[in-house]
Amino acid sequence: MKWLSRILTVIVTMSMACGALIFNRRHQLKTKTLNFNHKALTIIIPARNEEKRIGHLLHSIIQQQVPVDVIVMNDGSTDETARVARSYGATVVDVVDDTDGKWYGKSHACYQGVTHACTNRIAFVDADVTFLRKDAVETLINQYQLQGEKGLLSVQPYHITKRFYEGFSAIFNLMTVVGMNVFSTLDDGRTNQHAFGPVTLTNKEDYYATGGHKSANRHIIEGFALGSAYTSQSLPVTVYEGFPFVAFRMYQEGFQSLQEGWTKHLSTGAGGTKPKIMTAIVLWLFGSIASILGLCLSLKYRQMSVRKMVALYLSYTTQFIYLHRRVGQFSNLLMVCHPLLFMFFTKIFIQSWKQTHRYGVVEWKGRQYSISKEQ
């Protein structure tokens, strides 16, 4: 069995080498104090049945050091979303129904929201987002000024978990970030064409010139289409990590919601990663199974060194934790038991593949969307 031990050691070592390459380029927000004696920007929040989440976001907006307008686009909510939003002083606008079925997801709400914005700068922020610091919005504006106040800036929030099951989102969140290509030196350095969806910042002129969310009207995950629309107009598209300024808590409704959410995400947004980066990601993930396989076999066969296999597993686990700490706060127990996370990720990936290629339909928040029609 020594030969198998050597093979597994080589596989895990190669896997960790890939892990060192998939997220070795950082894109972090730079803070700077700015002075505004007028509204700095308009924050547009698309919301559908968000009464349990939107209050945290609105409270964090009130704490910001720069003055902003807040518009909550109420997209057919049947709960108290509108009442909660108004209690924080936000302007609530009911989304006009899409009777023609030409729009998917939140793009319809976002596009309508821009018509109510009073400032040139506009930011689209999901209802489950929270600004962690009082200078968070100020930092976003500063970063946007550094790119000449042109194009599109987007942020992937730091993922905060509170219940054990929420940690099963770990790999998905990491893949969302590294799958954008620009966080790896394996990227060829060409113009970025993709954007994160939870937090985006732009200006009205560029928004309307590119078509804005109209370019993503048939997309459930709008970031890729939005980024491509800006790139096609030779406008810059930038992506940043959220920590320590922006965070979100996902799928707090329960484990079923988590499964449905990530199935939707993979069904519609897994095609933008470049082949060599995707290959490195797959090889890195395979190291999780290879390391636990070596550990289990060493406990059964004396020819394999238990000490060596334990060291191999711990080495991979250390890197696994290190990479995930950049994107979120997850259960230490789940991090150590990463093969469980890998198996869950595989299950959802297969499930999303079936929905995309066999059924052509994905369901989210009580609405069904045809994947086969998404362009």
Swiss-Prot record:
GO molecular function: glycosyltransferase activity
UniProt keyword annotation of Ion transport present: no
UniProt xrefs under InterPro entries: Glyco_trans_2-like, Nucleotide-diphossugar_trans
Transmembrane parts of this sequence: 3-23, 164-184, 277-297, 330-350
Annotated disulfide bonds: none
Entry's EC annotation: 2.4.1.-
Top EC group: transferase
Membrane protein topology class: Multi-pass membrane protein
UniProtKB keywords: Carotenoid biosynthesis, Cell membrane, Glycosyltransferase, Membrane, Transferase, Transmembrane, Transmembrane helix
Compartments in which it is found: Cell membrane
Pathway it works in: Carotenoid biosynthesis; staphyloxanthin biosynthesis; staphyloxanthin from farnesyl diphosphate: step 4/5
Pfam families: Glycos_transf_2
Major localisation: membrane
Domain of life assignment: Bacteria
GO cellular component: plasma membrane
GO terms under biological process: carotenoid biosynthetic process
Record-linked Gene3D superfamilies: Spore Coat Polysaccharide Biosynthesis Protein SpsA, Chain A
Family to which the UniProt record says this protein belongs: Belongs to the glycosyltransferase 2 family. CrtQ subfamily.
Role: Catalyzes the glycosylation of 4,4'-diaponeurosporenoate, i.e. the esterification of glucose at the C1'' position with the carboxyl group of 4,4'-diaponeurosporenic acid, to form glycosyl-4,4'-diaponeurosporenoate. This is a step in the biosynthesis of staphyloxanthin, an orange pigment present in most staphylococci strains.
Protein name listed in UniProt: 4,4'-diaponeurosporenoate glycosyltransferase
Lineage: Bacteria, Bacillati, Bacillota, Bacilli, Bacillales
